């Protein structure tokens, strides 16, 4: 059974299609992470990074070192930076940009637009699809109208949306995003309450999503959901 676990902040662990995947793996500096970095040692198939801010790039370099068979999925420009600065070999990269699906051993991957900032590459969201389940991780983003197209093209079952405000959408804006994305199952809030700067009440998101006829699922750090 495919499974999703929230690791706090924007970090998400997926077990999907026989693959162990982590998205935006800030572990060491994540005050609410339920796991230590050694949990992932020799235990990952794929790392996905939406953009290079420290709270998303996180422990990617170290995770690539302690998982010598793992691959990295990110934009070409971000991967080029990591290859140049940290000697991550290109043969372990899956370079991409915003566009259509890429096959990774039976798992389908894609990058989407995000409205945010990033030093070494444009910011993105990520699509992961396998075992009949499609997940959209929005990365860091404000609200943008092309979310309608993301919903139309990829038809996500689950959407993971930042709701902390200040640097991303707030609960109200994220609920509007849900209405545009039209998830078949649940909208899951991320990127909130890690620090005081992004402190919000996730129940505000739940209420706004419900008003629009969709379902939100609030996970605690370390909590899983079967997909």
Swiss-Prot record:
Keywords: Hydrolase. It holds the Pfam family Lactamase_B_2. InterPro entries: Metallo-B-lactamas (IPR001279), RibonucZ/Hydroxyglut_hydro (IPR036866), UPF0173 (IPR022877), UPF0173_UPF0282_UlaG_hydrolase (IPR050114). GO terms for molecular function: hydrolase activity. It comes from the Archaea. SMART domains: Lactamase_B. Gene3D superfamilies: Ribonuclease Z/Hydroxyacylglutathione hydrolase-like. PANTHER family: UPF0173 METAL-DEPENDENT HYDROLASE MJ1163, UPF0173 METAL-DEPENDENT HYDROLASE MJ1163-RELATED. HAMAP family: UPF0173. Belongs to the UPF0173 family. This is UPF0173 metal-dependent hydrolase STK_14180.
């Amino acid at each position: 059974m495919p499974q999703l676990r929230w690791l706090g902040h924007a970090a998400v662990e997926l077990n999907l299609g026989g693959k162990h995947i982590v998205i935006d793996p800030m572990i060491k500096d994540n005050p609410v992470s339920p796991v230590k970095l050694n949990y992932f040692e020799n235990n990952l198939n794929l790392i996905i990074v939406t953009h290079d801010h420290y709270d998303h790039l996180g422990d990617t370099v170290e995770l690539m070192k302690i998982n010598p068979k793992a691959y990295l999925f990110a934009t070409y420009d971000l991967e080029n930076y990591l290859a140049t600065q940290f000697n991550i070999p290109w043969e372990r990269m899956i370079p991409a940009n915003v566009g259509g699906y890429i096959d990774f051993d039976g798992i389908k991957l894609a990058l989407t637009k995000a409205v945010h900032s990033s030093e070494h590459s444009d910011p993105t969201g990520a699509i992961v699809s396998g075992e009949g389940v499609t997940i959209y991780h929005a990365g860091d983003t404000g609200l943008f109208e092309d979310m309608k197209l993301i919903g139309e093209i990829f038809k996500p079952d689950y959407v993971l949306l930042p709701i902390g405000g200040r640097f991303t959408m707030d609960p109200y804006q994220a609920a509007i995003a849900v209405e545009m994305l039209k998830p078949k199952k649940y909208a899951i809030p991320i990127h909130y309450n890690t620090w005081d700067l992004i402190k919000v009440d996730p129940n505000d998101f739940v209420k706004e999503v419900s008003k629009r006829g969709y379902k939100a699922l609030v996970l605690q750090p370390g909590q899983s959901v079967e997909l």
